[in-house]
């Protein structure tokens, strides 16, 4: 459960690993005192968890950028999806270990991007 929102639609960036930027939908303090990145998505139809890997990479990258910019330690991420077909909300949660796993996958993708589009 959410205790309070600490960031909403905030632009974040980091110079870590070549740098990246994005706008996090929400960072909230939970009732247990930990913090979560919350990402809101819309879809035409319900999503299977195996279809949302890109979303998981995104929230993991946000979690690190939140630390780099604000020194707030993110312990979980939540992906909330609203779909037009059933109008039933979907909710996917990631713990600290999931965030580490997906951040490493994000770094692999970022490295490939910088190989394709070198800065220098």
Where are these regions (language model features)?
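Acidic-basic catalytic patches of nuclease active cores, encompassing PD-(D/E)XK
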Residues: 1-6
